[in-house]
């Protein structure tokens, strides 16, 4: 359940994450 919740959260906030230098650097999907 924890993993599913985290995956959903990342999917919903990936664009927001990629707009932040630190989060983007920690997320390979941001390129």
Swiss-Prot record:
Predominant cellular place of this UniProt entry's protein: secreted
Organ and tissue specificity: Expressed by the venom duct.
Keywords of this entry: Acetylcholine receptor inhibiting toxin, Amidation, Disulfide bond, Neurotoxin, Postsynaptic neurotoxin, Secreted, Toxin
Family per record: Belongs to the conotoxin A superfamily.
Domain comment (free text): The cysteine framework is I (CC-C-C). Alpha4/6 pattern.
Disulphide connectivity of cysteines: 17-23, 18-30
Keyword Secreted appears in the UniProt entry: yes
Organism field: Conus lividus (Livid cone)
GO cellular component annotations of the record: extracellular region; host cell postsynaptic membrane
Further facts: Negative results: does not show inhibition at neuronal alpha-4-beta-4, alpha-4-beta-2, alpha-6/alpha-3-beta-2-beta-3, alpha-3-beta-2, alpha-2-beta-2, alpha-9-alpha-10, alpha-7 nAChRs and muscle alpha-1-beta-1-delta-epsilon nAChR.
InterPro entries assigned: Conotoxin_a-typ
Residues that make up the propeptide removed upon maturation: 1-15
Subcellular location(s) of the protein: Secreted
Protein name, UniProt field: Alpha-conotoxin Li1.12
Molecular function, one GO term: toxin activity
UniProt function note: Alpha-conotoxins act on postsynaptic membranes, they bind to the nicotinic acetylcholine receptors (nAChR) and thus inhibit them. This toxin inhibits alpha-3-beta-4, alpha-6/alpha-3-beta-4, and alpha-2-beta-4 nAChRs.
Residue numbers carrying Cysteine amide: 30
Highest taxon above the source species: Eukaryota
């Amino acid at each position: 359940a924890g993993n599913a919740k985290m995956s959903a959260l990342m999917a919903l906030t990936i664009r927001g994450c990629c707009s932040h230098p630190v989060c983007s650097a920690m997320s390979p999907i941001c390129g």
